[in-house]
């Protein structure tokens, strides 16, 4: 129900974030419940899923435009590692969990410390310990690592065929650059580096595939740390989607969801 509601312009200009997602998702869920239906939350970003399932309180983490812009400028001038070192100095737990290239999350953690004089890692741990307000079944669809990596490589090849290079070139022509937090996303920063003459296209594609595989590995690590996840190893079902769906429906019925 939320697909297509957020335009690329909003994302690129950093006007969409987890708090807005939580607000929109909860409103959509209420709309679905009102129709007598069961919401299905689908996605791959663990923190966004957790924001809903644990109903995380973000009131202490409201964004402060002036300080955020100051941090973005520091990242642009001195690099991601400089910003990450700032985080390491005040919140080593978060620094250990957040990659230096994930500038958006580094900035969010620094903002939180700036506003509350306490680390966001402590706040997040407190929120994680909350019991979910929902009767839910948390499924994680999983495939063998070698197949996952092949699919990632194939998907990136397809993205290039569908115009990733042209899309990033258009954004560059509009004034977007690697110093912007939104342009640190996978696909953007690697292609921008190529367009800036830092390395050949073949190297940009190699780095993009490598970093996407690393990202997928971190996602799997996140889900393994989550409580009450139900892992659906697709090879155990011979990749038969009907069998997988039947098992998921059985779990939902057993839990009184259906």
What is each model feature region?
Residues 131-258:
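Catalytic core of IPPT-family isopentenyl/dimethylallyl transferases
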Residues 19-22, 59, 65-73, 165, ...:
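Conserved catalytic core of sirtuin-type NAD+-dependent deacylases
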Residues 7, 44, 109, 163, ...:
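Residue-level signal for inorganic ion chemistry
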Residues 13-47:
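Phosphate-binding/switch loop-helix module in NTP-utilizing enzymes
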Residues 6, 45-48, 57, 119, ...:
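Gly/Ser/Thr-rich beta-alpha loop segments that engage phosphate groups in nucleotides
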Residues 46, 52-158, 174:
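Long, charge-dense, solvent-exposed interaction surfaces that engage phosphate-rich ligands
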Residues 1-7, 12:
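Single conserved hydrophobic/aromatic residue that forms the stacking wall/gate
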Residues 28, 35, 77-78, 89-90, ...:
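Structured helix-beta-strand junction loops
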